[in-house]
């Protein structure tokens, strides 16, 4: 009987070096990894995972994340204060997709230019709102089913 290996790894939250390193290694080995990280934006989430993983993996952490990362979904919920207390909440999601080692997101990860990713996700989210991804968007193109 052949050995079985799980195809998907769910990790509730990455908060320490050991977990970050294991998440990066699993993703680098082709496993679909779904996890959460607390951060202010998609770049901050990636930076947090890379920074934590680097403590045990060294410089290979950024390269591994750059090659393995495919999708980041950043969610935020804010509440406005009203005269009766707290008003209605506002939900916002930002999507950042990467299509592997040659994608601009991967280049930013390897170079450590995390703040420069904002332009990439801004353009991607405009295309998502218009339901139009380009073939060069790779993952987004597949998700939106554009022909």
Task: Give the residues covered by each predicted segment.
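Short, flexible helix-loop junctions that flank or precede catalytic/ligand sites
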Residues: 1-147
């Amino acid at each position: 009987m052949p050995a079985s290996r799980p195809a998907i790894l769910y990790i509730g939250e990455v908060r320490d070096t050991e977990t970050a390193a294991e998440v990066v290694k699993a993703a680098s080995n082709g496993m679909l990894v779904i996890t959460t990280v607390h951060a202010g934006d998609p770049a901050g989430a990636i930076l947090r995972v890379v920074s934590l993983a680097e403590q045990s993996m060294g410089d290979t952490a950024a390269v591994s994340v750059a090659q393995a990362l495919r999708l980041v979904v950043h969610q935020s919920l804010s509440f406005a204060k009203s005269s009766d207390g707290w008003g209605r909440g506002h939900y916002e999601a930002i999507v950042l997709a990467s299509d592997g080692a040659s994608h601009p997101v991967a280049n930013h990860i390897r170079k450590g230019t995390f703040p420069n990713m904002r332009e990439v996700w801004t353009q991607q989210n405009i295309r998502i709102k218009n339901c139009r991804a380009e073939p060069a968007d790779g993952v987004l193109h597949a998700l939106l089913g554009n022909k």
